[in-house]
From Swiss-Prot:
This is Translational regulator CsrA. Its main location: cytoplasm. A key translational regulator that binds mRNA to regulate translation initiation and/or mRNA stability. Mediates global changes in gene expression, shifting from rapid growth to stress survival by linking envelope stress, the stringent response and the catabolite repression systems. Usually binds in the 5'-UTR; binding at or near the Shine-Dalgarno sequence prevents ribosome-binding, repressing translation, binding elsewhere in the 5'-UTR can activate translation and/or stabilize the mRNA. Its function is antagonized by small RNA(s). GO terms for molecular function: mRNA 5'-UTR binding. The gene is csrA. The keyword Cytoplasm applies. GO terms for biological process: mRNA catabolic process; negative regulation of translational initiation; positive regulation of translational initiation; regulation of carbohydrate metabolic process. NCBIfam families: csrA, PRK01712.1.
Amino acid sequence: MLILTRRVGETLMIGDEVTVTVLGVKGNQVRIGVNAPKEVSVHREEIYMRIQAEKENGTQGTGNF
């Protein structure tokens, strides 16, 4: 795992098209912004895991995450 230190307003690049920007830090919470092309899915881990579980169970959710 790559570990980076960023300050509020600083950005990191993932490949050529995805950026992750630190928007704010408040206590133990960090707000980040992600810019990615439409064809790149971006989800919180718990949402991604739910999507994967639904795929495995053959169900489709409403898509409202």
